[in-house]
From Swiss-Prot:
GO terms for cellular component: extracellular region. This is Short form salivary protein D7S1. The gene is D7S1. Residues 1-21 form the signal peptide. It comes from the Eukaryota. The keyword Nucleotide-binding does not apply. The keyword Signal applies. One of its GO terms (molecular function) is odorant binding.
Length: 148
């Protein structure tokens, strides 16, 4: 009985923490894109690339404030990304490492957070898990009605 109570308390604590987590994507959008709702809509729908004005800087802000990237988005911290995925039921550190290495080879020295985002969302090894985690962890941003 005590064990069940402990697990219930732990579960509700985790749910409470996840619901009240800071949305780094929303904070960066509020700081950098508050006057550009059409671009926020495209980001919300993940219909962006690094050639679009403001997107590279925005994604670097979102990834760096999440703790996922360093050095202007040039280095992805797969350990931190993997750690952030665990509460959502995903344990794919090896796959994150593989996709990140392939991405760095493809984009070279000019890589940025938007490139890492694209790689993680395109590769079969990570796309479903990463997108699910992103939508849940950053729900304050991704659940907004930005497209009207």
């Amino acid at each position: 009985m005590k064990q069940n109570v402990f697990f219930l308390i732990a579960y509700f604590s985790l749910v409470f923490c996840m619901c009240n987590a800071v949305s780094h994507f929303k904070n960066c959008a509020d700081k950098q894109l508050s006057d550009d709702k059409p671009l926020q809509c495209k980001i919300r729908n993940l219909q962006v690339d690094g050639n679009m004005p403001k997107v590279k800087e925005y994604m670097n802000c979102a990834f760096e404030s999440s703790g996922w990237a360093k050095d202007g988005g040039k280095k992805l911290d797969t350990s931190k990304v993997a750690q952030d995925m665990v509460p959502y039921g995903f344990n794919i550190k090896t796959e994150l490492d593989e996709v990140t290495k392939e991405c760095e080879t493809e984009f070279g020295a000019e890589i940025s957070s938007i490139d890492y985002l694209a790689c993680l969302l395109i590769d079969e090894k990570t796309k479903t898990q990463f997108k699910t985690m992103l939508m849940m962890k950053e729900a304050d941003f991704f659940k907004q009605n930005l497209c009207n």
